[in-house]
Amino acid sequence: MSDRRLRQVAVVLALIGLGVAGYLTYVHYEGIESVCGLGGDCEKVQTSEWADLAGVPVALLGLIGYATILTTLFVEREEALIAAALVAWVGFGFSAYLTYRELFSIDAICPWCVASAVIMTLLAIVMTTRLLRAPTDHRGAIPYIG
């Protein structure tokens, strides 16, 4: 897959992630019950002690993470690509931790949260693939491939 296609995939994933995290952030601040689907217990997850980190909703952290990744996709510098990969891998690790908490501490699953974890995992893979394939010149810049 070309870098251009990988970038397009990353943009789509980041936009979907923004939608999911945005919805969960909205649900948090409005205090409404989320549409959870069959077999899920979003309310239990979203009101658990792991729904906030130092008073900040984890959904808002996800929203910031997806927005950061999306923004970096339009910057033509190696540092932006490295930053996007780093944010995606931190998001992956944090999502894995939260999924563990869902399964073994909260004893409930939030399909929206799992969807976000899957999206962040895919973004980590796509961004790492782009980074590993990226040609660099002596100035550290990566040629922008549309």
Please report, for each region that a protein language model flagged, where it lies by residue.
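Membrane-interfacial helix-loop segments of redox and metal-homeostasis proteins
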Residues: 1-146
